[in-house]
Swiss-Prot record:
Involved in copper transport. The active site is at D367 (4-aspartylphosphate intermediate). Its EC number is 7.2.2.8. It catalyses: Cu(+)(in) + ATP + H2O = Cu(+)(out) + ADP + phosphate + H(+). It is a multi-pass membrane protein. This is Probable copper-transporting P-type ATPase B. GO terms for biological process: copper ion homeostasis. Belongs to the cation transport ATPase (P-type) (TC 3.A.3) family. Type IB subfamily. The chain crosses the membrane at residues 32-52, 57-77, 95-115, 127-147, 284-304, 315-335, 623-645, 649-671. Mg(2+) binds at D565, D569. InterPro entries: ATPase_P-typ_cyto_dom_N (IPR023299), ATPase_P-typ_P_site (IPR018303), ATPase_P-typ_TM_dom_sf (IPR023298), ATPase_P-typ_transduc_dom_A_sf (IPR008250), HAD-like_sf (IPR036412), HAD_sf (IPR023214), P-typ_ATPase_IB (IPR027256), P_typ_ATPase (IPR001757).
Length: 674
């Protein structure tokens, strides 16, 4: 089946392997209640109940009932832990499941021995069994893991909500104009679908009829409704607000925005950062630490008291209280929450390492056009320098060449020329001049569009006073050359984004230096930089110059973040310690960029830094808890404070172990963007 032609969102739910027991999630709830039925009579018939109550539930042969029920409980209720431990050993990564499996196995096997000694041996005295402890241990473990898996599942909740945004069906407009409700999986590219007010838009597409306002808050985090007119793009999963629209489908299945986002997030969550690799290693050592401490505590208490029941209880408690799981989940749970929140707000984290690196960023380098400014240019001035050519002829020549480019400056010139009703032609042999402009043939004459740097480098004469006047007003200026003569010019202005000023101020408050990198001329660059409060400016750059500048800053030991276009600035984004591709829109699969910002909003740079800070704080909290819990709990379980009467039973150990993981999960779930 070709997924590029079919929509499939039935299986969007992410599959994160947070632990070796993730696949038992559905079993824990059922197993807990079934095990409870077996555990109640075991507990009621135990000698412990006779000590605590004025009457006993025991009857002749009740010890056999306890044995049979305990055996069923061990193999049924204990199965997730026994099979989980087996899987961990097979993978040569023994951890929490192996410890629990060892604990309940020791309790069960010793209880079998005690049952034999009490019923079939001629030895005098009574050997205490652990059937009561075994029952409570398995019950608490099942309950704890059921609660834990619910908490773990909530960590990636934002991503699951995204998966549920797409409807199951859509209204397809047939060739004969009839409307027909079809499954999403039957929708193909170029189909026309109709979406009424209040409905979820089923696929990515282009509006071909109607206009509306669209709520993208659940898709990109855009809080305000976005006005959409004919020929505007819409994203599948966003909510159609005010009018009925018809949408031509542009992407389905894995090519759709939501599918791409969830694919990138899943990939990021499966990759391990250096901090996670370290916590995994420590969690792995913790297994051996717990086993060694458990065995030593058994030997020491046998030497001190010669009481096998007490010594064995210490061993079992150590095995069940140690929780490499809390340490192992400390980072993955925060990551799941962080990447999901990011995706929900239009911040796609492709490289998790960048979240850690962001704590140490010294410089944020930004392209001017489209990042700090709107990138929507307006033509403010155009002029002919040749007596026999009118201003409109110059405009026509500019538009003819620029019609072959998709650069924002080019699009602005073409649109302006059309609005002036000035005609232009299709040129021949148009070539891009990197970092300069274009050249091509019009009516068998060669024309070049260049910047002022090209004129200076090649000794062309031009009106420098006019250039300075227009440039200081913030205009980008292009020149037209024919037969080694400058015959005309055009000046285009760009607006600074409202949020750029605040973003620069926020960077400075964080002691991060903003740097402007632009191919535009010095005058324009410094005019924009001055208004924004940026003092570090590099102008008139070729594409390769940006990469070189980043390298120079890094050579002094600085950490550099680069923000720019995911395609044109690809080398710079790759060179930087963190590359942020801004304004990706629905094309979130751009190759370069550790972080993808769906919107062209400079505020999202600060949002990423805030998310990074909050994420790292939660990771550190969880690591301290995971490590600190084990450092304190294991010696307590071994009986380190038994001399003052503080002794933990296996049941209490099981409760503490389950709680330790639940606390880590809840702490991860409290992570917020702001």
């Amino acid at each position: 089946m070709n997924h590029s032609n079919h929509m499939h969102h039935d299986n969007h739910e992410s599959h994160h392997h947070y632990s070796g027991h993730a696949h038992h999630h559905g079993n824990f709830k059922v197993k807990f209640f079934v095990s409870l039925i077996f555990a109640i009579p075991i507990i009621l018939l135990s000698p412990m109940m006779g000590v605590n109550l004025p009457f006993q539930f025991t009857f002749p042969g009740s010890e056999w009932v306890v044995l049979i029920l305990s055996t069923i409980l061990f193999f049924y209720g204990g199965k997730p832990f026994l099979s989980g431990g087996k899987d961990e050993i097979a993978a040569k990564k023994p951890g929490m499941m192996t410890l629990v499996a060892l604990g309940i196995s020791v309790a069960y096997i010793y209880s079998l021995y005690a049952f034999y000694m009490n019923n079939f041996s001629s030895a005098t005295g009574h050997t205490m069994d652990f059937f009561w402890e075994l029952a409570t241990l398995i019950l608490i473990m099942l309950l704890g893991h059921w609660i834990e898996m619910n908490a773990v599942g909530n960590a990636g909740d934002a991503l699951k909500k995204m998966a549920e945004l797409l409807p199951n069906s859509a209204i397809k407009v047939m060739d004969n104009g009839q409307r027909e409700e079809v499954k999403i999986s039957d929708i193909m590219t170029d189909d026309i679908v109709e979406v009424k007010a209040g409905e979820s838009i089923p696929t990515d597409g282009i509006i071909v009829q109607g206009q509306t306002s669209v709520d993208e808050s659940l898709v990109t985090g855009e809080s305000k409704k976005v006005q959409k007119n004919q020929n505007d793009n819409v994203i599948g999963g966003s909510i159609n607000g005010s009018g009925t629209i018809q949408v031509k489908v542009t992407a389905v299945g894995e090519d759709g925005y939501l599918s791409q986002v969830m694919g990138l997030v899943n990939q990021a969550q499966n990759d391990k950062s250096s901090a996670e690799l370290l916590s995994d290693k420590v969690a792995g050592y913790l297994f051996y630490f717990a086993v060694i401490v458990g065995v030593i505590s058994f030997i020491v208490w046998m030497l001190i008291q010669n009481d096998v029941d007490f010594a064995l209880e210490r061993l079992v408690t150590v095995l069940v209280i140690a929780c490499p799981h809390a340490l192992g989940l400390a980072i993955p749970l925060v990551t799941a929450r962080s990447t999901s929140i990011g995706a929900h707000n239009g911040l796609i984290i492709k490289n998790r390492e960048s979240v850690e690196i962001a704590q140490h960023i010294d410089y944020v380098m930004m392209d001017k056009t489209g990042t700090l400014t709107e990138g929507n240019f307006s033509v403010n001035h155009y002029e002919s320098f040749k007596n026999d050519l009118s201003n409109d002829t110059i405009l026509s020549l500019f538009a003819s060449l620029e019609s072959q480019s998709n650069h924002p400056l080019a699009i602005s010139i073409v649109d302006f020329t059309k609005s002036k009703n000035v005609s232009f032609t299709n040129p021949q042999d148009v070539n891009n001049i990197p970092g300069v402009g274009l050249e091509g043939l019009i009516d068998n004459k060669t024309y070049k569009i260049t910047n002022v740097s090209y004129l200076d480098q090649h000794g062309f004469e031009y009106d420098n006073d006019l250039f300075i006047k227009l440039a200081q007003q913030g205009n980008s200026i292009s020149y037209l050359i024919e037969d080694q003569q400058v015959i005309g010019m055009i000046a285009q202005g760009d607006q600074i984004k409202e949020s750029s000023k605040q973003m620069v101020a926020d960077l400075l408050s964080r002691h991060i230096t903003p740097v402007m990198l632009t191919g535009d001329n010095d005058e324009v660059a410094h005019a924009v930089a001055k208004e924004l409060g940026i003092s570090d400016v590099h102008a008139q750059l070729m594409p390769e110059d940006k990469e070189s500048i980043i390298k120079d800053y890094q050579s002094d030991g600085n950490k550099v973040m680069m923000v720019g276009d995911g395609i044109n600035d690809a080398p710079s984004l790759i060179r930087a310690d963190i590359g942020i591709a801004i304004g990706a829109g629905t094309d979130v699969a751009v190759d370069s960029g550790d972080i993808i910002l769906v919107k062209s909003n400079p505020s999202d740079i600060i949002h990423f830094l805030t998310l990074s800070n909050n994420t790292m704080r939660k990771m550190v909290q969880n690591l301290w808890w995971g490590a600190g819990y084990n450092i304190v709990a294991v010696p307590l379980a071994a009986g380190a404070l038994a001399f003052i009467g503080l002794i933990l039973s296996p049941a209490v150990g099981a409760i503490l172990m389950s709680l330790s993981t639940v606390i880590v999960a809840i702490n991860a779930f409290t992570l917020k963007l702001k």
